[in-house]
Structure formats: C-alpha cells, structure tokens
C-alpha cells in the first residue's frame, strides 16, 4: 500500500473517501465540524438522529455529502475525546483500514492524524498509522495451497497534517514507519515459518540474502560448528548436539559510520529454531509453539533490515544464534559440566534452560567488536511470562543509562518494556558444587536468575537483556509471531542516530 502526506482543507479534497473522527457522545472532531459547516449541518443532523454515537469501533459511511468534493466520508468512532490514548488511537486506525477495505475504497485521505493524542506529536501519529496499517494487513499464507484472498482494494492512504510546516516530519514518519513495518513483517515471517523449513541454515540463508540486497554496507559471515569448536564455544555446541541440523551463527555487520572510533552496537538474537527441551523434554501440549524460540534472532534480523533500509549513520552488528535443542543419543544431559568460551564452567541441571547456554558463548564472542553496547533478545524464561504476562517485555541491564534509553524507546514506540532487578543476592541461586555455576537457579525469580547467569559473561561492556518469552508470539485464535521487539530496538537505534521523532 502506498502512503503519502499532505496539508489541506477537508472540503477541498477530491478523493474516493475522507476519514474523520467522531467522539462520544455524538461530538464531531474539529475536522468533522468543518465538513459539517460546509454541508449545512448534514453530518450533525445524522448524529442527532442516532446514526452514530462515536463509541470506539463504530463507523458510518456517507455518500455524496452536500458541497463536499469527495465521493464519500467515513466517520470513525473514537470514544471519549479525553480518553484517546496511544492504544485507542491504534485501534481507531486498525478499524479504519478494515472498514475502507470492506467498503471497497481504493484510496482515502485520512484526517485522524490530526486528532489529539496526549503527549504525541504529528510525527508519532503518522508513523504509528503506517505501522498499524501494515500490521492490520499482515497475513502468513505462504504454505497454504488453497488461499482465500481477502478483499483488499485499498491501495493509497494520504495522511493530512495541520500545516505545511509538518510535511517534512510527516514524510520522514512515513519513511521510518514503512522501514520498521517491513522489519516487523520480516521478523514475523521468520517466526511463523515451521521448524522443518526454518532451521539454522535457513536463518543463515536469510542473513546472506540481506547482505546481497544491501551489499554497499552490509556483510554477513556464517560460523559453523567446526569454527565454533576452534573458538571454544563448547556451551553453544552442546545444545545442538542432539540435532541433525548443524548449529550456525550468522553475523550481520552494517557499517553506516566510517569513522575509526565509531564503535558498533551489537544485537544478539537467540535462534533456537525448535526447542523440544532436550533430555529434559517439554510436555507435548503446546510444544508446536517452540518453533517461536527463535523469535529473538528473527527480531534482530528484522531490525538489521530496517537499519540497512534507512541507511542509519551508525554501526550495528546483528548476531543470529541458530541452533536446535533435540533429544537423542548425542544430546547433552543433566549433570554435564560445560566449559564456555569465557573459560567459566557450567553444570547443566536442566537441558531445557538451553538459551542461556547458547547466548553466554555469543556474548563472549562479541567482545572482539569492542562494542558501544550489547543487547541480547531472547524468548528466555517462562518465569518472565508469569511476572509480566504477554504485554510487556522484561528488561535487565548492568548499565543504568542504557536502561533509561531502552525504556524511553519502548515508551516512544509503544513496544513496552519493564526493568527487572539484577541484584547480587540473586547470583547466589546459581551456585554449584561441581562447576563455577549452574544453568538454573530454581523457581523463585527465574527470569532474574537467567539474567544474572548472562551477566557473568558481559563484564567487559554495557549490556542489556530483553526477555521476550511473553511478547514474541500469540496463542489461540490469533496465533502467530508478533514481531516484537523490533519496534523498540528500531526506536532505540533511531534515537542513537539522531532521529528521535521531535518536530
């Protein structure tokens, strides 16, 4: 779908459809009031007759309104004006896109971006409208042979901004929104792909294709098991021993700043393309969803695509830690003691706590890049789901300024995170009689002890950990990958690059 931005009066628009808001109870938005005045009270008369209350989700399509050049006007219920927040705004946009498609509109001029959303500027409203529109239209049907094509005639959406001064920020918002939406789609597509197709080799092929598409400043290197062995990544290798699919680590390097002292930001994504639990095997119910255990790597891939598309003037490295955790004659066992790349030893008490065993070696590997910061993204613990549910990502870090940056980016993007503690007292739960540490610390504070485990491998740089176990995918009727936290990380990198969304 094509997006553009303009500034103009609603009555002068020659379009198939104009979209304006109506508040509860039967209150016209400022733009709707202009149209009502031009049409000699036509719209307000309809509202007085009870045609539309303005409740969220309500719609009313008007044809050939007097003195209005556009063929149709779509009135969208926005709820109570003072209660219009970010979440409600996105729901209004979603309802708009679905209604326009259902009613056969091929193009529309949308004035909803002029609604007042507390604390949000026009850049934010336009960008979120683009991202929400793309999200609304997303479907994953690549593997279906009998595809039912939904009715989607809408091809062009024009967002109106109040004055010409905001056109530049509006155009930038569309550019950013489309790049972020494409990154989210890429992450969702990878996450939704079945594990018999999406293994570590498939992740590597996607990483190579990204380098081919943006060859000017993207390089991809794939590190196989033999190289991992030479590097001493025995913990990473142990997790994949039971699988016939080779473990592969894909390193995507984007260089947007040629300065010698420009240190990279490193993103590390857990890429367990299927996690059976290994010898500590999971229950069969819901095990199919363990294809989503690579959503951290999928998110990193999506972010790298966004960075390359926007040609951000920073250096970013994305690592996709591809692996598969399966039971078998060669699988690692509870009781094994592994020597990590850092030289520290780990007693395996549960083979289903495997993500941290992969990540710890990758976190050691990335020291060679002398990073400005390292952020790992992982569907790491069920404990984080218990703590925060399915709405907010867990954040842990060894660096307060980095925490503040990420929390701010999560608020800006609407892809929210919440900081969990990382106190020394939790480290005691990882003590082992037979190694430097155990790979689990018991049930209490399980998300935090997992973060504590990783923190032991991140002492040489500023580091943050995002536990997306509760936010990476949805179950039930709307089952599928969410693409989170692509939006959060994209905003973080946009801020680092100087594009903080201020007008």
Swiss-Prot record:
Q: How is the cofactor bound?
A: Binds 2 manganese ions per subunit.
Gene3D superfamilies the record matches: Leucine Aminopeptidase, subunit E, domain 1, Zn peptidases
Keyword terms of this UniProt record: Aminopeptidase, Cytoplasm, Hydrolase, Manganese, Metal-binding, Protease
Q: Name one GO biological process term.
A: proteolysis
Active site, UniProt feature: 282, 356
PROSITE patterns associated with the record: CYTOSOL_AP
Q: Which residues bind Mn(2+) 1?
A: 275, 352, 354
Which NCBIfam families is this protein grouped with?
PRK00913.1-1 (NF002072), PRK00913.1-2 (NF002073), PRK00913.1-4 (NF002074)
The record's family statement is:
Belongs to the peptidase M17 family.
What is this protein's record name? Probable cytosol aminopeptidase
